[in-house]
Curated annotation (Swiss-Prot):
Region (G2): 60-64
Assembly, per entry: Monomer.
Region (G1): 19-26
InterPro entries: EF-Tu_GTP-bd (IPR041709), EF-Tu_GTPase (IPR050055), EFTu-like_2 (IPR004161), EFTU_2 (IPR033720), G_TR_CS (IPR031157), P-loop_NTPase (IPR027417), Small_GTP-bd (IPR005225), T_Tr_GTP-bd_dom (IPR000795)
Name of the protein: Elongation factor Tu
Signal sequence extent: none
UniProt domain tr-type G: residue ranges: 10-204
Localization annotation: Cytoplasm
Record gene name: tuf
PANTHER family from the UniProt entry: ELONGATION FACTOR TU, MITOCHONDRIAL, ELONGATION FACTOR TU-RELATED
């Protein structure tokens, strides 16, 4: 089926398969495309096509990811599948593949394993909001009680990390049997996708979120005032809107947008993705700087201390050659600027090796507009040594 035929009229959702190595994530991905292809909603992909995922170099880090797309009756999906565990860690922390929901694949023959736990924790930390469970390899388990036991274990594990374990849909199936065309098991794939359709909500569009624009540059126009330029990250801004200037200062300043300009043309409004200049009333040139954000009043606050999930680049990826310890003071690059911060490691962690991922507490020397889920990179003298995502705000 030609790519051109895909209808873009359906709502779009990004999902991915997560779970322990060899529990069947890639086989399930292949099975979904193969089963949906029969209804004309996908291009069937074999296991080998997905498993030979190309390595992508996202900002200097090598991540192997397979991207497939398919559709159900109600939605269009982009689906990511990573062959290696390290690929997931990098993918989820850098946001290279945003997920609106995940399909957690657990082998019924083995039950939850270490990476099952790690992927659930990562999903929690990086803000994957919804998880649906596919208990795989059920054709290999004859004992109904054993299946129920594994299901209970998975539900408990999800609850432990703050997901609604009791309410999450769990589908029992066999990806391999479905891939081989056995009708009973194909039906389980259809059931899985029906649950994904129903349980994972359509994400809010970027334009519907509260306005936010990182300030990239500032200049003054004689007789008109101060202009802040940048790319609108989310939401919509209209002439006459009251916005706040947030970050790098003790207090947020409030101002009115008196003009919006894009490619030297004046606009009434701008939206997510637009590169604009915003003319700000009563703001002096020195009152605003790169690294601050313009945002809808009250929508976001500046914070200096937070917990983050961090992935440290290995030496081969251009990162550090040596470990770092508590009280390490690198720069944290948020959106458009570097801010120095100091690191506290969790109890029992003496040091962090290149290539590790770790949860840490970071205290910046100046507050920055951040929220749970805000991405950042860690730099030393302009060289990136790690990536992170804000997990929880401390103060």
């Amino acid at each position: 089926m030609a790519k051109a035929k895909f209808e873009r009229s359906k709502p779009h959702v990004n999902i991915g398969t997560i779970g322990h190595v060899d529990h069947g994530k890639t086989t399930l991905t292949a099975a979904i495309t193969t089963v949906l292809a029969k209804a004309g909603g996908a291009e069937a992909r074999g296991y080998d096509q997905i498993d030979a995922a190309p390595e992508e170099r996202e900002r200097g880090i090598t991540i192997s990811t397979a991207h497939v797309e398919y559709e159900t009756e109600t939605r269009h999906y982009a689906h990511v599948d990573c062959p290696g565990h390290a690929d997931y860690v990098k993918n989820m922390i850098t946001g290279a593949a945003q997920m609106d929901g995940g399909i957690l694949v657990v082998s019924a023959a083995d039950g939850p394993m270490p990476q099952t736990r790690e992927h659930i924790l990562l999903s929690r930390q990086v803000g994957v909001p919804y998880i649906v469970v596919f208990l795989n390899k059920c054709d290999m388990v004859d004992d109904e009680e054993l299946l129920e036991l594994v299901e209970m274990e998975v539900r408990d594990l999800l609850s432990e990390y703050g997901f609604p374990g009791d309410d999450i849909p769990v589908i029992k199936g066999s990806a391999l049997k479905a891939l081989q065309g056995e009708a009973d098991w194909e039906a389980k794939i259809i059931e899985l996708m029906a649950e994904v359709d129903a349980y994972i909500p359509t994400p809010e569009r970027e334009t519907d979120k509260p306005f936010l624009m990182p300030v990239e540059d500032v200049f003054s126009i004689t007789g008109r005032g101060t202009v802040a330029t940048g790319r609108v990250e989310r939401g919509i801004v209209k002439v006459g809107d009251v916005v706040e200037i947030i970050g790098l200062a003790e207090e947020n300043a409030s101002t009115t947008v008196t003009g919006v300009e894009m490619f030297r043309k004046l606009l009434d409004q701008a939206q997510a993705g637009d590169n604009i200049g915003a003319l700000l009333r009563g703001v002096a040139r020195e009152d605003i700087q790169r690294g601050q954000v313009l945002a809808k009043s009250g929508s976001v606050k500046a914070h200096a201390k937070f917990k983050a999930e961090v992935f440290v680049l290995s030496k081969e990826e251009g990162g550090r050659h040596t470990p770092f310890f508590a009280n390490y003071r690198p720069q944290f690059y948020f959106r458009t600027t570097d801010v120095t911060g100091i690191i506290q490691l969790p109890e029992g962690t003496e040091m962090v090796m290149p290539g590790d991922n770790v949860e840490m507490t970071i205290e910046l020397i100046a507050p920055i507009a951040i929220e749970e889920g805000t991405k950042f990179s860690i730099r030393e003298g302009g060289r990136t040594v790690g990536y992170g995502v804000v997990a929880t705000i401390v103060e």
